[in-house]
Curated annotation (Swiss-Prot):
Sequence similarity: Belongs to the TspO/BZRP family.
Membrane topology classification: Multi-pass membrane protein
One biological process term in Gene Ontology: photosynthesis
Classification via InterPro entries: TspO/MBR-related_sf, TspO_MBR
Entry's transmembrane regions: 3-23, 37-57, 76-96, 101-121, 129-149
Subcellular locations according to the entry: Cell inner membrane
Name by which UniProt lists this protein: Protein CrtK
Protein encoded by which gene: crtK
Pathway: Carotenoid biosynthesis; spheroidene biosynthesis
One GO cellular component term: plasma membrane
Species this protein is from: Rhodobacter capsulatus (strain ATCC BAA-309 / NBRC 16581 / SB1003)
Coiled coil segments of this chain: none
Length: 160
């Protein structure tokens, strides 16, 4: 695995993660009704940091195989899609306070993460395996987003 490629992918992940500093949960999120099973606040940065490291390692490993495997190229394209979609969720949910919009983004994120996982697995099983915790975490995040959306009706419609 190339450390340079790892660094490139990790910078992309760090940019996605930086949206959490720009659009922090704050008082608005604290005021929302949440399900009893909501993970503790300290878990989110730990989970995302771990996932970003795993995502970067797996992408760097698959990148090393891209010259000889078309599925590796497709997997990396889906990796780029998922990190772009990942970057959208925080500004939509925490910045715009759009619970339904956040849910839509999470559905797209789950699909792109799952596709990346399957494609990476077909190229390098260890890289695919490193994406399994991400699939699980986005599944939990989707369930949490859906629950918060349902528990807090009355979201203002999006106006253009």
């Amino acid at each position: 695995m190339s450390l340079t490629l790892f660094a490139v992918y990790f910078v992309a992940c760090a940019c996605a993660g930086a949206t959490g500093a720009i659009f922090s949960p704050g008082a608005w999120y604290d005021s929302l009704k949440k399900p009893s099973w909501v993970p503790p606040n300290w878990l989110f940065p730990v989970a995302w940091s771990t996932l970003y490291i795993l995502m970067s390692i797996s992408a760097a490993r698959v990148s090393g195989l891209a010259m000889e495997n078309e599925l590796a190229v497709l997997g990396l394209a889906f990796w780029a899609v998922q990190i772009a979609v990942n970057t959208l969720w925080t500004p939509i949910f925490f910045g715009l306070h759009r619970l339904a919009g956040g849910m839509l983004v999470l559905v797209l994120l789950w699909l792109s993460v799952f596709a990346t996982c399957v494609l990476f697995w077909s190229v390098d099983w260890l890289s695919g395996l490193m994406f399994v915790p991400y699939v699980i975490w986005v599944t939990v995040a989707g369930a949490l987003n859906f629950s918060v959306w349902r528990l807090n009706p009355g979201e203002k419609p999006i106006t253009l």
